[in-house]
Amino acid sequence: MPRVKRGVTARARHKKITDAATGYRGRRKNVFRIAKQAVMRAGQYAYRDRRNKKRVFRALWIARINAAVRQHDMTYSVFMNGMKKAAIELDRKVLSDMAIADKAAFAALVTRIKSVVNAAA
């Protein structure tokens, strides 16, 4: 069996890691053993935070909707319950956007939901 020299593959592997670690501070950017750990940890953080990002944005949308709805003397939970009863299927992202960008349309939506909630009560 012929001897395999691994210089090319080792260099490619090291280069891949050190390229991923560019911009890091200290020895993390150029010492392979330390850079490898830093890149692995960065990947873990990226994986975790791609999931957390969804939670954070949903919380932001809910906070915005709640603030906008409270200006019309209503709470978020009553508003969302009214949305279900009125069979209006707008997601929180769109509602949040509407509350900021198109206040008139949002106000019309709130008045419609108020009428649905008052009719049910």
Curated annotation (Swiss-Prot):
Organism of derivation: Polynucleobacter asymbioticus (strain DSM 18221 / CIP 109841 / QLW-P1DMWA-1)
Recorded GO CC terms: ribonucleoprotein complex; ribosome
Protein name per Swiss-Prot or TrEMBL: Large ribosomal subunit protein bL20
BP GO annotations: ribosomal large subunit assembly; translation
Keywords, in A-Z order: Ribonucleoprotein, Ribosomal protein, RNA-binding, rRNA-binding
UniProt GO MF annotations: rRNA binding; structural constituent of ribosome
UniProt function note: Binds directly to 23S ribosomal RNA and is necessary for the in vitro assembly process of the 50S ribosomal subunit. It is not involved in the protein synthesizing functions of that subunit.
Family: Belongs to the bacterial ribosomal protein bL20 family.
HAMAP family assigned to the protein according to its UniProt record, in alphabetical order: Ribosomal_bL20 (MF_00382)
PANTHER family: 39S RIBOSOMAL PROTEIN L20 (PTHR10986)
One Pfam family of this chain: Ribosomal_L20
